[in-house]
Amino acid sequence: IDRKLERYDSPRYTYMVIDKKNPVDVFIVTSYPDEWADIYTSQNYQHIDPIVLTAFKRISPFAWDENITILSDLKSSKIFALSKKYNIVNGFTFVLHDHMNNLAMLSLIMDNNADKGLNSRIESDKDRLQMNLIKIHEKMLMLEQNKLGVSNGKNTDTSGKGILSPRENEVLHWASMGKTYPEIALIAGITTRTVKHHMGNVVKKLGVINARQAIRLGVELELIKPVLV
């Protein structure tokens, strides 16, 4: 996601997927601090978030300020304190309703001090950004399908292997447990340089931009297999 947004000066973003049959089931990848995502999901703010409620009724992208009701609802909602804390005051949301009855959204946040031309750039590039959301969501569904295939004893990869090699899985597992690269190297009996190499491969395979996001995605999608010691 980060790479796809570099051409727009890397605005803050949230990619969110909600099961429309069971809105409690929500998945979030965001550039915000973990605290924001933890509070949002633990409080089930997707049920009252005016951006989400608007997206449920839309199939086209929308600017938050195109409809004064959205911003006024945001300010009157319980979510406002959280939004204000992280300076989430205005933005642009792209919407996708998929074949599995999910609502997927990519929201780009417009900071108060943002480039004045950013809004017009996003407006003129709506088609490209909408396609980015489609590609991002398709990648997520493929990762999810891979996870389900492994858990069912069936592998969706024609090579007979999971999306991560055993060593990549081991590195990601220990990283998700809070181990540093030197500690992982000691546990796995490899060099720190090799640990970094494997983590780099994990980042590429998961389509994220850094190890922190790879760990979060691996945990969220339950892609990490237990490692026996």
From Swiss-Prot:
Entries under InterPro entries matching the protein: Sig_transdc_resp-reg_C-effctor (IPR016032), TF_LuxR_autoind-bd_dom (IPR005143), TF_LuxR_autoind-bd_dom_sf (IPR036693), Tscrpt_reg_LuxR_C (IPR000792), WH-like_DNA-bd_sf (IPR036388)
Every HTH luxR-type domain range: 157-222
One GO BP annotation of this record: quorum sensing
Keywords, sorted A to Z: Activator, DNA-binding, Quorum sensing, Transcription, Transcription regulation
UniProt KW NADP keyword: no
One annotated GO molecular function: DNA binding
DNA-binding region extent: 181-200
Protein role: Probable transcriptional activator. Binds to an autoinducer molecule.
Protein family (similarity comment): Belongs to the autoinducer-regulated transcriptional regulatory protein family.
Name of the protein this chain belongs to: Transcriptional activator protein YukR
Organism: Yersinia ruckeri
Lineage, opening ranks: Bacteria, Pseudomonadati, Pseudomonadota, Gammaproteobacteria, Enterobacterales
